[in-house]
């Protein structure tokens, strides 16, 4: 669920305004408070824990900043992803990282994940377009309630995990459901099914 705040801001003003650990995004100058449910938090926590363990197991050069923003290159827009995976050595090249915990280069981000709440149109449309334009190589939409439009997840609607992977500058989409193992470029040996992620339980 989201709640808008009625004051237009530039991205720089937004950075000055927001407080540390606050859950806000900037959508074309509009400040939006991100409000989540308990189940949403369970799915995010489970998935981030599993990806962190996989990073350690495979000795991958990744970090998981919890409150970092991803800035759009062309608009007064900054997103606060549910899970953001960044390359450790790329952070020194990010001009806003030290001061504002903000990522501006898509090449710094091997994977970005959004867990769908009632604002599913943002995840499926606006954010997908922005992440593709930034050149982020992999984007997951975790729709554990099957809320997205039927054009995205089919009909009848059902829980679906969508993996967008960048090919020649455009996202190609794969859908995963039930006991299907999720295929990832950033985590090539990850052994998780869509069902495990939706339930937030590791049952092998």
Predicted regions and their residues:
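Gly/Pro/Ser/Thr-rich low-complexity, intrinsically disordered segments predominantly at protein N-termini
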Residues: 1-204
